[in-house]
A protein has these predicted regions:
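Dinucleotide-binding Rossmann-like beta1-alpha1 core, especially the glycine-rich loop
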Residues: 67-152
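Extreme N-terminal leader/targeting segments of oxidoreductases
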Residues: 1-26, 41-45
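Core beta-strand elements of the Rossmann-like FAD/NAD(P) dinucleotide-binding domain
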Residues: 22-24, 219-229
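A conserved short coil-to-beta-strand element within the FAD-binding core of flavoproteins
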Residues: 194-210
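Glycine-rich FAD pyrophosphate-binding loop
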Residues: 43-65
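Short hydrophobic core segments
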Residues: 28-29, 225-235
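Helix-loop-beta segment of a Rossmann-like dinucleotide-binding subdomain
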Residues: 150-188, 209-215, 221-225
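Flavin (primarily FAD) binding-site architecture
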Residues: 232-247
Length: 252
């Protein structure tokens, strides 16, 4: 990206807000899924909220997910994790309802080549489906014959195929959902700025962070932003932020 390019008027007006003598209730470092979620929640509760990202929004891990909103099928092996499975199913249903233009049901087929393999998978997936009681199921788990499996998966290895099992989860566009959350936060009054990395901190008398120093990559101008609360949502770069505050801390 050309950081010498002229920025748009909308960005300039946002940056001007940083020059106001204002103490923000919430300051968030990181514009990925976690930061966006915090921004929505804080702004919706009436807190003055500002968010900074050193790159573009959703440029890190939040754009490199599996693209799945699954109900936790991989956790079915351990009964101690079944509570987590149930929680994942509830969240999956909420996302399907709140963002149907981004999150949608998706079928998955497990081809089976061993005797009783279909029955083995079917038993586990039926239990998985049963845990979606109360309207949280996405689709019906079903046996598939070898012919039907080949019809639905034309590229599957046909030699020795006994059949298949189809179950349902959900798929989504991670970056689009992230940006949708950011737009929601902005509509609630949050100030969101990308390409504005954090470059330093100032502490108050009690050791708490009272000022966060940031720098606009386009203009090179630095700003000192007063805040009451800081959220480190920098993802894999969270340790870098922690060491800026306390160089002696152990890494996560």
């Amino acid at each position: 990206m050309d950081f010498n390019a002229k920025t748009n008027p909308g960005r300039e007006s946002r940056l001007q807000q940083l020059e106001e003598d204002k103490v923000w209730d919430v300051l968030i470092i990181g514009g990925g899924a976690t930061g966006a979620g915090i921004a929505v929640d804080a702004a919706a509760r009436g807190f003055s909220t500002v968010l900074f990202d050193t790159q573009d929004f959703s440029e890190g891990t939040s754009s490199r997910s599996t693209k799945l909103i699954h109900g936790g099928v991989r956790y079915m092996k351990n009964p101690r994790d079944w509570k987590l499975v149930r929680e994942a199913m509830i969240e999956r249903k909420l996302l399907l309802g709140n963002a149907p233009h981004i999150v949608h049901p998706e079928p998955f087929i497990l081809p089976c080549y061993e005797n009783f393999e279909r029955e083995y998978y079917m038993a586990g997936l039926c239990l998985y489906g049963a845990m979606a009681y109360g309207g949280y199921e996405v689709g019906k788990t079903e046996f598939l014959s070898a012919a039907e499996t080949i019809r639905r998966l034309p590229g599957v290895k046909a030699d020795g195929l006994k059949g298949g099992v189809q179950f349902w989860d959900a798929q989504f566009d991670d970056s689009r959902l992230n940006i949708a959350l950011m737009k929601t936060a902005e509509a609630r009054g949050a100030l969101l700025l990308n390409y504005v990395p954090v470059v330093g901190f100032e502490r108050g008398c009690g050791g708490e962070i009272t000022v966060v120093k940031v720098k606009d990559k386009f203009s090179g101008k630095e700003y000192s932003v007063k805040t009451r609360m800081v959220f480190n949502a920098a993802g894999v770069w969270a340790d870098e932020i922690r060491r800026m505050v306390s160089p002696e801390v152990k890494p996560f």
